[in-house]
Design a protein with these regions (language model features):
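Extended active-site neighborhood of metal-dependent phosphoesterases/phosphodiesterases
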Residues: 97-209, 307
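Divalent metal-coordination and catalytic microenvironments
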Residues: 31, 80, 85, 98, ...
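Binuclear metal-dependent phosphoesterase catalytic core
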Residues: 172, 282-319
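N-terminal active-site segment of His-dependent metallophosphoesterases
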Residues: 16-92
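Active-site environment of divalent metal-dependent phosphoester hydrolases
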Residues: 35-38, 88-90, 119-127, 186-189, ...
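Active-site-proximal beta-strand elements of phosphoester/diester hydrolases
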Residues: 23-36, 175-189, 227, 283-288, ...
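His/acidic metal-ligating clusters that form di-metal
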Residues: 72-79, 112, 177-180, 191-283
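Hydrophobic h-region of N-terminal signal peptides that target proteins for export
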Residues: 9-17
Length: 319
């Protein structure tokens, strides 16, 4: 069943007005975790052990993304936001496969796609090829390579880019700007110890960038909406204690900063859960993973002073 939630956010009203009609549509997907087919040289114990310790349908990730892309082409939104974890583990071949087979198809159809990295996407020691009982490392991407691969999906058309991270600002419509925040800690990943850091934080320099860009947007007469991978508001009471790595570090202060910057809504992912929650600062619209049940994506329509957030789930794939 599709789930529709109506939110009364004046911050997004300009989206409808900017298009010259009463409605404006965008879609949101998260945690695509696409695994390029060539990463599975030979199925065997190594890949099956990996799957048994995870909750992702990695072997079906390409087919899932193909089905979702066809759904999005049918929806034909103005904008698609992808809130991080684009790949299984930051493999260069997975990033290229996602762009070449899916994102480029959406772009050619007229959908403007904007991405932000997740904790799996950059400088990841877990980027491997599975070959029977063994694995071997394969090429991951650096921050600059990530921006190059996704040049047509946020970085080339950015109004401004943060020198300290992969954060950027883009114009979504007349009167509305996107602040895409990179809060990942990929520079702390350790190849010797095979550690990929799950948690996130916003660097002081990036916080200054966000404030400066929010001020520039205000002076230009624009409202702002934010997307990032890590959560800003807890989605259940114990989350800050039992699963703090799924919230950005010092999340209360981050929420206050975003509120002060005029951002009412933050689109997030990371937790592979589908939820919308609000505290005294912002509303966190968390979108679940495409490769985890129930494989959701969101369709967001703005009409007047109402924003409807509709959740659709992928029920089946051909295989």
């Amino acid at each position: 069943m599709n789930k529709i939630i109506l939110l009364l956010f004046s911050v997004l009203c300009l989206m409808g007005r900017a298009q010259g009609n009463s409605e404006w549509k965008m879609c949101v997907v998260s945690d695509v975790h696409l695994m390029a087919p060539e990463l599975l040289k030979s199925d065997g114990k190594a890949f099956q052990d990996y799957l048994s310790s995870d909750r992702k349908l990695l072997g079906e990730s390409v087919e899932i993304m193909d089905s979702i892309t066809n759904r999005l082409l049918a929806e034909h939104p103005k904008v698609l936001l992808v809130t991080g974890d684009l790949t299984k583990d930051g493999e260069n071949v997975s990033h290229q496969y996602l762009v070449d087979h899916f994102l480029s198809k959406l772009r050619r159809s007229g959908v403007r796609v904007f991405v932000v990295p997740g904790n799996h996407d950059v400088n990841n020691p877990h980027a491997v090829v599975f070959d029977g009982d063994k694995t071997r490392r394969t090429t991951t991407v650096s921050p600059s390579e990530f921006a190059s691969v996704y040049a047509d999906y946020g970085y080339r058309q950015a109004l401004a880019r943060d020198a300290a991270s992969l954060s950027y600002v883009a114009q979504l419509a007349s009167g509305l700007r996107l602040i895409a925040i990179d809060a990942c800690k990929y520079e702390e990943n350790d190849f010797d110890k095979n550690i990929c850091v799950t948690g996130g934080r916003i660097k002081p320099a990036t916080q200054r960038f966000i404030r400066e860009q929010a001020d520039a947007a205000k002076k230009a007469g624009c409202k702002v909406v934010v997307m990032m991978h890590h959560g800003v508001v807890p989605h259940f009471s114990a989350q800050p204690v039992v699963l703090p790595e799924y919230l950005v570090d010092d999340y209360p202060a981050v929420g206050r900063m975003l509120r002060d910057c005029g951002a009412d809504v933050v689109f997030t992912g990371h937790f592979h859960s589908q939820d919308i929650t609000r505290d005294s600062t912002v509303t966190d619209v968390e979108t679940g993973s495409l490769v985890s049940y129930p494989h959701p994506y969101r369709v967001i329509e703005v009409s007047g002073d109402k924003m409807s957030v509709t959740t659709h789930n992928l029920r089946s794939i051909e295989s």
